[in-house]
């Protein structure tokens, strides 16, 4: 993403944003909220004097409008963000309009920008030059390919074939060929992950049959398979080392710490009331929040108060397993400095 800060005073102002990928559109879904004023170019029917005589001939023309946001919907698989609200600037003031924001679509957002908002903008900008990392989670007879988005792993495809130990050699080789074929279209790094020896066998197959892919890949040992293997890879910090974006790795690590402390009845609390109390007493060292809640006024106040009390705030993606686990705990938790 590219960003151009127009003017911000005491946290309020305008930032022009240029999303370049579906990751950037996802970031936008957390940077635009009801009540914000959003400007973008769109198409609307603009009537001329001639059109009024023949209204059915009114043509749609590109116009720049500003809407007061009422609803924001992220459509992951169409790479689109739908932003609906009342027009405050431009033709047909007072009418409803929906902006369909896509990659390479400039938008200006006027709002109060919190510290976490600015950090999200910085993350999107800093990640714009990174190539997409893919993880092939492989086990005997099945391989799953995942594309690592900034909000978590996105499954691309699953390949299944009878390649167990009792299967013929050509069957296993056929499975490897099937698993390697989609990798030919990938330009970024590929991580081959899984338990046992099959990942190493597949890596040797790539080196012999597809050396260009092998040169752009690395092997990582995991205990789990499928999506679980991907989470292990991220938790080990491998993605961060390759792509330079450490956020997903932090999410895995912090949620592992939350669950560890819960199991040990350690310095941990969760739930709005409990976390709010910990923050007010200065006991919260790190506050962990689901991205589903960051626009909730009560939670936003807790995040601001936590930062004032020198606690760090970490926002977890609800599209990723650690964020799903946090949501099951009420969407907010805090690692404590001392017991309450």
Curated annotation (Swiss-Prot):
GO cellular component, one term: cytoplasm
A molecular-function term among this protein's GO annotations: metal ion binding
Main location as per UniProt: cytoplasm
Biological-process GO terms, alphabetical: nonfunctional rRNA decay; nuclear-transcribed mRNA catabolic process, no-go decay; nuclear-transcribed mRNA catabolic process, non-stop decay; ribosome disassembly; RNA surveillance
Record keywords: Cytoplasm, Endonuclease, Hydrolase, Metal-binding, Nuclease
Enzyme Commission code(s) on record: 3.1.-.-
SUPFAM superfamilies: Dom34/Pelota N-terminal domain-like, L30e-like, Translational machinery components
Cofactor: a divalent metal cation
UniProt cross-references to InterPro entries, sorted A to Z: eFR1_2_sf, eRF1_1_Pelota, eRF1_3, Pelota/DOM34_N, Pelota_arc, Ribosomal_eL30-like_sf, Transl-rel_pelota
SMART domains: eRF1_1
Subcellular localization(s) per the UniProt record: Cytoplasm
Family annotation (PANTHER family): PELOTA, PROTEIN PELOTA HOMOLOG
Record remark on domains: The N-terminal domain has the RNA-binding Sm fold. It harbors the endoribonuclease activity.
Record text on subunit structure and interactions: Monomer.
Known function: May function in recognizing stalled ribosomes, interact with stem-loop structures in stalled mRNA molecules, and effect endonucleolytic cleavage of the mRNA. May play a role in the release non-functional ribosomes and degradation of damaged mRNAs. Has endoribonuclease activity.
Family: Belongs to the eukaryotic release factor 1 family. Pelota subfamily.
Protein name (database record): Protein pelota homolog
């Amino acid at each position: 993403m590219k960003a151009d800060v127009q003017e911000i005073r005491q946290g309020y102002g305008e930032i022009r944003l240029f999303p370049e990928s579906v990751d950037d559109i996802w970031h936008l879904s957390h940077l635009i909220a009801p009540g914000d004023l959003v400007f973008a170019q769109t198409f609307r029917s603009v009537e001329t004097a001639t059109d009024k005589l023949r209204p059915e001939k009114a043509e749609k023309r590109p116009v720049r409008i500003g809407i007061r946001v009422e609803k924001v919907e992220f459509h992951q698989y169409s790479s689109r963000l739908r932003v609906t609200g009342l027009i405050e600037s431009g033709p047909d003031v007072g009418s409803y309009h929906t902006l369909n924001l896509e990659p390479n679509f400039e938008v200006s957002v006027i709002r109060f920008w919190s510290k976490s908002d600015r950090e999200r903008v910085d993350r999107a900008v800093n990640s714009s030059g990174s190539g997409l990392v893919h993880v092939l989670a492989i086990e005997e007879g099945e391989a799953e390919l995942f594309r690592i988005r900034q909000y978590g792993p996105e499954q691309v495809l699953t390949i299944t074939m009878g390649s167990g130990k009792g299967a013929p050699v050509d069957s296993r080789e056929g499975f490897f060929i099937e698993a390697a074929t989609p990798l030919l279209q990938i330009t970024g790094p590929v991580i081959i992950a899984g338990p046992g020896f099959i990942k190493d066998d597949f890596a040797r197959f790539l080196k012999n049959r597809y050396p260009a892919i092998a040169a752009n890949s690395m092997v990582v040992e995991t205990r789990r398979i499928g999506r679980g293997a991907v989470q292990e890879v991220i938790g080990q910090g491998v993605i961060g080392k390759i792509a330079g974006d450490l956020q997903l790795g932090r999410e895995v690590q912090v949620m592992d710490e939350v669950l560890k402390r819960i199991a040990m009845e350690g310095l941990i609390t969760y739930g709005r009331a409990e976390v709010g109390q910990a923050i007010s007493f200065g006991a919260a060292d790190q506050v962990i929040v689901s991205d589903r809640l960051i626009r909730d006024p009560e939670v936003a106040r807790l995040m601001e108060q936590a930062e004032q009390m020198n606690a760090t705030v970490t926002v977890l993606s609800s599209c990723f397993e650690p964020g799903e686990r946090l949501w099951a705990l009420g969407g907010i938790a805090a690692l404590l400095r001392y017991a309450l």
